[in-house]
Amino acid sequence: MRGVSTPDRRPVLPGLALTLIAGLCLVPAAPAQEADPSEERIEELERRIEQLEERLEAEEDAEPEEALPDDSEADPTTAELERRLEILAAELERQRLGEAAVAAGEGEHGMGPAASKIYRTAEGLSIGGYGEMLYQAPDSTRDDGTPSGRGDELDFLRAVLYFGYKFNDRWLFNSEIELEHASTDQEGSASVEFAYVDWLARPAANARFGLVLVPMGFVNELHEPPIFLGARRPDVEQVIIPTTWRENGVGLFGDAGPFAYRTYLVNGLDASGFSARGLRGGRQKGSGAKAEDFAWVGRLDWVDTPGLLAGVSLYRGGSGQGLTDPAGRVIEATTTLWEGHVEWKKRGFELRGLAVRGEVDDVARLNAALGLEGEASVGEKLEGWYLQAGYDLAVPFAGLRGSLVPYLRLEAYDTQAAVPAGFAANPANDVESWTLGLAYKPIDQVVFKADFQDYDNEAGTGVDQVNVAVGYLF
């Protein structure tokens, strides 16, 4: 219940979260209770890191000298010393955490770090997972001054377990079982997010069979909380690309020179679930999926430059699934989505951008079949984009433990960028937003996030909100 004290009460939880994040950065490491079996290796790595740091300092303090033309034994450059230092630091972290630890960011074949554990397993069973708890505090009023009707919420959003089994070097099974909102009694659910069999033939060509994640954008495949910025996933990758999006299908994946690719044939979307708010309701999620119409999806990424990922993806297929208009004619509802994405990470900087556009055919007849009128039309065109930047303050400030990343994200999307003649677009579906926040990771596998989101739309009904989240993977 909100009263006059609401403005004073609202910042309490976010403020506590920011205080906790700041405090965790300064907490000293707990002393080890007993010697680790790898202690000698750890001491050796620490010694080598110290030597490299001393050489770097000496290199920076020294006067520049002209290199000799035949100086094949010249000392390594500063950049090379820094590269070696990063490699040793990563190895030291792995030794300290143990072999069972998942290195955040090290995914394989389009899967997240924890989801990729099975690929690093010699044989037999692999278990991993992730989870996230989210506090959301929306404003009590909309931009136009009317009540938002929304209250604060604290939700254990997801608890996920990965189960994989490697039969041999060629064949493996991988799956994700997701529990949402903690209890099925409170609008929660239990779902299979993916379940597939891989045939690992060769690096350039492998096969996948089963319930697969559609390879579009960043977050649909890589959605483990410690590996993306923001207490909440980007809106563009929920509204235009309907994350988490999975369908039944078969396909190929692999690495070809400097490129990585994935291409699948999957059951199509179900247009009877489309609405003015997008395609999200058309996902079939592998459950009794209608298969009157199929779709093709393909993705190609440049992965040959360290720290750089750049690529495109395309989805196209029928979504009618046997639906007919009032005249009895079959509706194809051919649906096309294409997107481009780029991510660059270097020395603490993290930049990410994505743009996506979608088209749906036969929308006038689809509206008639679904009984949609006025501003409720399905969009003939949908579009969105976002830009995101973050910087790890632990890079220049060596005293900070873990990772501390302030971030900013700008987004815009419109689920009714075009509608058929005789219909109107709802201005509330033309949205712009910005997100400003802070993410702290004491270790790679655990993250605390807090951010503020400002929402504006053409109807003036945007509702700003504060979010605080904790996430993990293993």
Language-model features, listed with the residues they occupy:
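N-terminal secretory signal peptides that target proteins for export/translocation
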Residues: M1-P11
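Bacterial N-terminal signal peptides
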Residues: G15-C25
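N-terminal periplasmic/intermembrane-space "pro-region" immediately following the signal or transit peptide
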Residues: A30-E132, D139-D144, F474
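Outer membrane beta-barrel
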Residues: A114-D143, S148-S272, E292-V297, D301-L309, ...
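Outer-membrane beta-barrel pore domains
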Residues: S148, A195-L200, N220, F228, ...
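Active-site rim elements
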Residues: V239, R283-S287, E375
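Active-site glycine- and acidic-residue-rich loops that bind
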Residues: T243, S287-F294, R329-T334
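Loop-centered beta-sheet repeat module
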Residues: G273, G278-L323
